[in-house]
Amino acid sequence: MQAATETIVAIATAQGRGGVGIVRISGPLAGQIAVAVSGRQLKARHAHYGPFLDAGGQVIDEGLSLYFPGPNSFTGEDVLELQGHGGPVVLDLLVQRCLELGARQARPGEFSERAFLNDKLDLAQAEAIADLIEASSEQAARNALRSLQGEFSRRVHALTEQLISLRIYVEAAIDFPEEEIDFLADGHVLGLLEKVRTELSTVQREASQGALLRDGMTVVIAGRPNAGKSSLLNALAGREAAIVTDIAGTTRDVLREHIHIDGMPLHVVDTAGLRDTEDHVEKIGVERALKAIGEADRVLLVVDATAPEAADPFSLWPEFLDQRPEPGKVTLIRNKADLSTESIGLEESADGHVTITLSARTGAGLELLREHLKACMGFEQTAESGFSARRRHLEALRQAGQALEHGHSQLIHNGAGELLAEDLRQAQQHLGEITGAFTPDDLLGRIFSSFCIGK
């Protein structure tokens, strides 16, 4: 535990007027401030109703005073909460009184930062506080709460413990060469390594789902000109976000629209029609479309169900196959069902490809697409599964997986225990970045500075 020398204060409730406003104080002067403001000694962990006093003994407000001596508090330090009326003037006067008594204004996220530094929370849990506050759907809020309760951290710690056990075995064999352990023939190391890689892959998959729920899924609408891409964007957005005409090539640039489906955020990107063209401006639009396809979380490949080439849509644009994400992230949209003989519906092939037949113009089948996109974001997770994750967590997991893959290759092809030991160390370090065990100070500063003041 790190002892803080400064006492900090901030308004913990949202800006503006409200029924209740909270001023939070943390640090060694919290107890003295409690006596000065409330005019009496406060019993620990009890709510005391009474006046809040200024320096002259005049009443600023009336409300509840709660004192939590450290280390049994949110920050691990002495903490005081003053819960009064939610008027900004009253709250500012309370903060000013605390400043007069020796506290200083807290930085954004400093309360959570102190909780982290005092081992009350790890870094993933601290970030989950902000995620819970900013959650835009019930599922995102549930996931953030599970991360705050330590679910994500437990998964990471379990992987770390397995890596430590594996490192002990490998490094002991290196330190005692007289034992002459053949890592490859032994089978024990390879078995443990495969187990860790499998479990890491599972955590990566669940973390990716959690990140989509938190940050929103980027959905790129792609296809040939006049397939109805812009009409589909307008239908999803519920407004005329894109110009729609019968002229092929109307959309020449990337158009972005941010929407919510049952509170779940989606970043929908309409792109230029994919075709060979001599038009310089349209050619740039096609290049940008292909780039957007490569960066998408999900691609909606839109085809005109009335066109002859719709029978084999993936042959419409060969470069699409090179730029698109993995096959499971592509949904085929057979549009203009109102002009064809096809029935509205959703089909899933044996290889996992999903095809949705709809009409963007009439809206028929649009609800199927919405439900499909919600499922892609993890909307169907139960309350007992899933956790919140951020992009930096995904990157740390990716790098850990990369290190394990390299170590596995070294073991299989070279039987190189020394190189495997280094890869295991790197994988452990990358996992430690998630919980804060191995995190540079500048990164910590960036993370906590993004929090609300008073959190």
Swiss-Prot record:
- What EC number(s) are associated with this protein in UniProt? 3.6.-.-
Bound how, and how many: what does the cofactor note say? Answer: Binds 1 potassium ion per subunit.
Instruction: Name a GO CC annotation attached to this entry.
Output: cytosol
Protein name listed in UniProt: tRNA modification GTPase MnmE
Similarity remark = Belongs to the TRAFAC class TrmE-Era-EngA-EngB-Septin-like GTPase superfamily. TrmE GTPase family.
Q: Where does (6S)-5-formyl-5,6,7,8-tetrahydrofolate bind?
A: R24, E81, K120, K455
Q: From the UniProt record, which GO molecular function terms apply?
A: GTP binding; GTPase activity; metal ion binding
Names of the cofactor(s)? K(+)
Q: Which PANTHER family match?
A: TRNA MODIFICATION GTPASE GTPBP3 (PTHR42714), TRNA MODIFICATION GTPASE GTPBP3, MITOCHONDRIAL (PTHR42714:SF2)
